[in-house]
Amino acid sequence: MPNIVLSRIDERLIHGQVGVQWVGFAGANLVLVANDEVAEDPVQQNLMEMVLAEGIAVRFWTLQKVIDNIHRAADRQKILLVCKTPADFLTLVKGGVPVNRINVGNMHYANGKQQIAKTVSVDAGDIAAFNDLKTAGVECFVQGVPTEPAVDLFKLL
């Protein structure tokens, strides 16, 4: 079974909070970005790689590649798995990726979204995906940075 030390939803994927604070807090040595678009975009990949400290590996995989390959991960790989949306995590969970808890970080406000926390805004599709994750036994909590208290996402919906 892969050693996923943290699963996080963050629309920005890898940036300062993830690359420095969360990687260190979780003790991760590999950041796995599960996103179909970024997996095919070397420019975005290069920008994200610059944020990570030396010695932290990074992979940019499509959702299907994560589903097909995550179980091959070595025990020594301490994986921080990051997706942009709850729907992406739902796809991974339905595909057999062992995710039990999801840290909900940054989901930006846009038209049609409702702000439920300082850094989290959701629409009907997000809520449906979160509810399906809950049904699958996945705990979801809002926590922007490790020093903030974790708040049960389902108490905010």
Swiss-Prot record:
Source organism: Escherichia coli (strain K12)
Function of the protein: The phosphoenolpyruvate-dependent sugar phosphotransferase system (sugar PTS), a major carbohydrate active -transport system, catalyzes the phosphorylation of incoming sugar substrates concomitantly with their translocation across the cell membrane. This system is involved in N-acetylgalactosamine transport.
Keyword annotations from UniProtKB, A to Z: Cytoplasm, Kinase, Phosphotransferase system, Sugar transport, Transferase, Transport
CC terms in the record's Gene Ontology section: cytoplasm
The UniProt record lists the keyword Phosphoprotein: no
Gene name for this UniProt entry: agaV
Record InterPro entries: PTS_IIB_sorbose-sp, PTS_IIB_sorbose-sp_sf, PTS_IIB_sorbose-sp_subgr
Residue span(s) of domain PTS EIIB type-4: 1-157
Residues at the catalytic site: 15
Name of the protein: N-acetylgalactosamine-specific phosphotransferase enzyme IIB component 2
Short name of one Pfam family: PTSIIB_sorb
EC number: 2.7.1.-
Stored CDD domains: PTS_IIB_man
